[in-house]
Amino acid sequence: MKKQNNLRSLAAQAVEQVVEQGQSLSNVLPPLQQKVADKDKALLQELCFGVLRTLSQLEWLINKLMSRPMTGKQRTVHYLIMVGFYQLLYTRVPPHAALAETVEGAVAIKRPQLKGLINGVLRQFQRQQETLLNEFATSDARFLHPGWLVKRLQNAYPTQWQHIIEANNQRPPMWLRVNRTHHTRDGWLGLLEDAGMKGYPHPDYPDAVRLETPAPVHALPGFAEGWVTVQDASAQGCAVFLAPQNGEHILDLCAAPGGKTTHILEVAPEADVLAVDIDEQRLSRVYDNLKRLGMKATVKQGDGRYPSQWCGEQQFDRILLDAPCSATGVIRRHPDIKWLRRDRDIAELAQLQAEILDAVWPRLKPGGTLVYATCSVLPEENRDQIKAFLQRTPDAALSETGTPDQPGQQNLPGGEEGDGFFYAKLIKK
């Protein structure tokens, strides 16, 4: 491999762009993966995700082993050392190879004069590893979450916060959604077994299958033909609660990348679906999903706060509002969220959610259903949000999900279950 495409240096650059520049890993990683051989793409992804998952531990180690931080143009070296720590702690990369490749990464980022420093810090860590890890185990950094988020989780879930944090720090399972217009779930599970893989049905969501071992999509029976879609079990709950029917006019708001749009159409193939999202670029994913599954929907770019701009005075039988949120329920799937979010974001997001709810409620027909959903675990975005909405909206009533005091259903992330998700099903009187 060319030195400028040193895997460790690319991982360091990716993490730096996330932490220092506030970019999401899903935007940063794909262009960097184009620079490495196919056989190395999985390792590059593992290094990026792993460093972001354990960032507070790696930062703590650097502070212990270095007298002053790397700044300015040398900042990438800070993250390169983190990549070295991560390999030594969490991967099967032989220690000598981890050291050699990480040190060589300094050349790729044009800092060859710092090879000795990187080598020295990593070797010092190896010598002191047991002592350092024992000390780390009693530090605040051990939770691998920013302090503000730990406090919010402790306040919201006094008996469950550690469970949530532990779940967030795990690798996520791979959930699939079987397209019921092509196969029954049991029928597709048989095809999966014929392909040498094993899957397990979800007890509550009728299309959901968890793979025993994650697999590339091209290995899944009928993926290209639209027989199956990658979608977390909890995300599949949205269409289950919405219960769309053929012939209905349905709005899927904040629809990108289209997983829920296509699920609605699998459940009700004759429904008239309008999929709206504010992000023009992400709408391309909606088109891609519709095309792969051979489905049709009207797709528009628009801001949920101003429905007259994208649907005139049209009203809908059902509305799915998958509201913009902190995404604190999907941290195990997107560990960069921990470092991209700020405490102040929560109040701003809650205000935006309230504005969208108030704007789209008049577009729901009397007797119609609105499902409000987030991939958050924070009450400000979920139960508190719906409680306030019910208080100010006399023609809204809760259905199926929770009680007026505790409205909605909150799923927490964990183990082999789905991601953290919240749903509230509202009926217009």
From Swiss-Prot:
Q: Where is the active site?
A: C375
Q: Where in the cell is it found?
A: Cytoplasm
**Residues reported in the UniProt entry to bind S-adenosyl-L-methionine:** C254, A255, A256, P257, G258, G259, K260, D277, D303, D322
NCBIfam families from the entry?
A: PRK10901.1 (NF008149), PRK14902.1 (NF011494), rsmB (TIGR00563)
Reported EC number(s) for this entry are 2.1.1.176
Q: Mark out the compositionally biased spans (Polar residues).
A: 400-412
From the UniProt entry, list the residue stretches annotated as the region Disordered.
397-419
Q: What is its main location?
A: cytoplasm
Query: Which cellular component terms (GO) are annotated to the entry?
Result: cytosol
Q: What's the encoding gene here?
A: rsmB
Any keyword DNA repair? no
Functional description taken from the UniProt entry = Specifically methylates the cytosine at position 967 (m5C967) of 16S rRNA.
Q: Which UniProt keywords apply?
A: Cytoplasm, Methyltransferase, RNA-binding, rRNA processing, S-adenosyl-L-methionine, Transferase
Q: What is this protein called?
A: Ribosomal RNA small subunit methyltransferase B
**Recorded family membership:** Belongs to the class I-like SAM-binding methyltransferase superfamily. RsmB/NOP family.
List the molecular function annotations (GO) for this entry: RNA binding; rRNA (cytosine-C5-)-methyltransferase activity
- Going by the entry's taxonomy, the superkingdom of the source organism is recorded as Bacteria
Write down the InterPro entries for this protein, in alphabetical order: MeTrfase_RsmB-F_NOP2_cat (IPR049560), MeTrfase_RsmB-F_NOP2_dom (IPR001678), NusB-like_sf (IPR035926), NusB_RsmB_TIM44 (IPR006027), RCMT (IPR023267), rRNA_ssu_MeTfrase_B (IPR004573), rRNA_ssu_MeTfrase_B_ent (IPR023541), RsmB-like_ferredoxin (IPR054728)
One Pfam family, please name it. Methyltr_RsmB-F
Q: Which organism is it from?
A: Salmonella newport (strain SL254)
